[in-house]
């Protein structure tokens, strides 16, 4: 978890635009910040993780440039975005999903994303797929309406995902690996 990372890292900063307040806690802190104007000095991070963020940003290239400003030369950028196929199904299933404020503003195609990353000054050295078991959850959510609460199949699937994340049983790990 976050505490484990914080114990091994010299310092850790997490940012969230919707955060109510800043929460410093030992060697890590949570900040409310914009990806376009990060509140850090040039070259202040050894590594940056941008997980499931880029697809929410209207100016993705601007955000990548800003990350390049705070990242030390040669430092890695770990980036993840939703897979094109499953995301396209979500968009097809739900007008609400694809038009919700703060939601996903684009679907990335792998080659186009890699080209943009390279053009932004980074080098793609590895890629893989993950979260295959989460895809049916989002399809269910989109079928019934992403903001609808109390739909039993969605709630049960969510419980399965939480159980899987916490327990990591071999059967779901195998299914995830095969489906990815």
List PLM regions with ranges.
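A structural motif corresponding to the C-terminal end of an alpha-helix
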Residues: 116-122
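Short, flexible active-site-adjacent loop segments at beta-strand->alpha-helix junctions, enriched
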Residues: 54, 83-85, 95, 128-133
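A C-terminal cap/extension of S-adenosyl-L-methionine-dependent methyltransferases
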Residues: 92, 125, 130-180
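Acceptor-substrate binding/catalytic loop of class I
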Residues: 95-112, 129-130
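Conserved beta-strand segments of alpha/beta enzyme cores
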Residues: 27-29, 123-126
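Short, hinge-like loop/turn segments at secondary-structure boundaries
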Residues: 12-14, 95-98, 142-146
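Soluble or luminal CAZymes and related metallo-dependent hydrolases
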Residues: 4, 59, 105-109, 163-167, ...
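Conserved SAM-binding loop
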Residues: 1-90, 110-114
């Amino acid at each position: 978890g976050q505490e484990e990372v914080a114990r091994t890292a010299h310092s850790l900063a997490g940012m969230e635009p919707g955060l109510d307040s800043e929460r410093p806690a030992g060697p890590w802190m949570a900040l409310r910040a914009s990806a376009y104007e990060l509140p850090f000095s040039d070259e202040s991070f050894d590594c940056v993780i941008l997980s499931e963020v880029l697809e929410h940003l209207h100016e993705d290239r601007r955000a990548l440039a800003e990350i390049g400003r705070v990242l030390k030369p040669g430092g890695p950028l770990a980036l993840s975005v939703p897979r094109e196929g499953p995301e396209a199904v979500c968009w097809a299933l739900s007008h609400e999903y694809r038009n919700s404020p703060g939601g996903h503003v684009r679907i990335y195609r792998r080659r186009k994303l890699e080209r943009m990353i390279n053009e932004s000054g980074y080098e793609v050295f590895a890629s893989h797929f993950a979260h295959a078991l989460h895809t049916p959850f989002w399809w269910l959510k989109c079928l019934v309406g992403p903001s609808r609460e109390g739909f039993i199949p969605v709630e049960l699937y969510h419980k399965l995902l939480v159980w899987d994340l916490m327990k990591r049983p071999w059967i779901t790990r195998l299914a995830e690996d095969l489906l990815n």
